[in-house]
Amino acid sequence: MKPYLLPPLAALVLAQLSVASCDGGSTADPGPPPDAKLDQANRAGTQALSMDMPSLAVTQYKTALQRAYERDDAGAIADVSYNLALAQMKGGDAKAALATVRDARLDLERRRAPVPAELFLVQAAAAYRSGDLTTADSAAQEALGRVSKDGDTAPRAWFIRGLVAAQRGDATALAQAIAKLPPSKEADLQADRQELEGRAALLDNRATDALDLFQRAAANRQQALDYRGMARALALAADAASRAGRTAEAADLAMRAGRSALLQGDTATALPLLRQANELARQSGQSGIVDEVARLRKVAAK
């Protein structure tokens, strides 16, 4: 059950230098005054990211980060590095995100400035997407051990720890992570809990329960405008449906997951899902899905 992607970190509030600083400065030491060039580039990056333009966001955040280093501002370095890593993650470049976090951490540690929890969180997410479960788990634990200005940091760190536990087949650790995610009215946080509960159900061989949970998670990801997370949940639902012997439903879910991934530009994820959908559709005699998969493959080949 290979994960398609990481938790919806792009839904986290992007730090804006004019209103927040990851170093938690006090009123006695407010730090340097705002810098128009830095703030403008940072805001432009945030706007680009909100419009699903991660490449442009990366360019703008790199400009802002260069300015932050130019003025030797530890708080700005932490803030903008976090934003840049998020944009790199959304653009599918987890390795670049890890490098961004590494550079920021080294700079902050050399000057004995505190490393904010959010940097550890995005490191955990990038490591998980890269397949480094050990680093993902340890970075998530670091995030949990630090004070954060964002109340969502802790539940998202527990979500990553839960994903790691599920990958390892560790039902006990997965149950612990689920227990740390209380019910929430926020769609994305609801989806986090439902996804972990679905993974726990699969570990317990309760495929039908898992299918229901993953479908509910997909609906909540959609409500949160997290289409990458929605596609992942649909792919997990397809796996659960297949395990439950519901081949026709699995074919439809896999096709929808693959189509969404393809239209997001993630061909590497889309093609295996479309192949799975094609095989399941042929097994269940669904010519309509076979035809749709063929059409989507032509789109991918262009």
Identify the role of each PLM range:
Residues V13-L14, S18-D79, N83:
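N-terminal leader/linker segments that initiate helical-solenoid repeat arrays
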Residues P30-P32, E70-D73, E109-A113, V147-G151, ...:
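Short coil/turn linkers that connect adjacent helices within long alpha-helical scaffolds
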Residues D39, D79, E118, R156-F159, ...:
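Residue register of alpha-helical TPR repeats
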Residues R43, A76, N83, V122, ...:
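"A position-specific structural signal for the A-helix of alpha-solenoid helical repeats
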Residues T63-R67, R102-E109, Q141-R146, I178-E186, ...:
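Amphipathic alpha-helical segments of tetratricopeptide repeats
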